[in-house]
Amino acid sequence: MKNSLSIAVVFTILLFGLLFIPLAGEVENTFVFFLGRFHPIILHLPIGALIVLFLMEIINDFRPDLNLNSACNILLWFSVISIIPTIILGFLLASSGNYNDELLNTHKWLGWFTALICIWLVVLRQKKSSNKPNSVTRFYKMFLLVNVSLLLFAGHYGGS
């Protein structure tokens, strides 16, 4: 629990640091643009992992005898580990300034909040009791639903 909290704090600070990357073509660095072009390639990793996690949590509610907790933990950690470079590359790609400002801004904030919630889901998941439902379990499930919803909207605006 303590390790996941420390990691969540570090990743949250990293996310806040990304907000200082200038957008709208203020950075003129070909290497930055090159790296940013990998955003559309790797973004499918956290998307797939979060959606599969969401489905596995639903299955786990209806069939606790399957005991999918370990698999859910692995998927959630994989989501966090893959969402961080996805967000970084997205900010680098956005810095090229070749995008509709309104769509880019909406996509940026939806993606940023998706990453932030994903990071803190790890803490909630480790704190919740797998044996009996409690308030942390309800918060975890509610935030997972919110996260998947944000993910769907972020993907919609990013693909536009």
Predicted regions located by residue number:
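Polytopic transmembrane helical bundles with strong interfacial aromatic enrichment
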Residues: 1-160
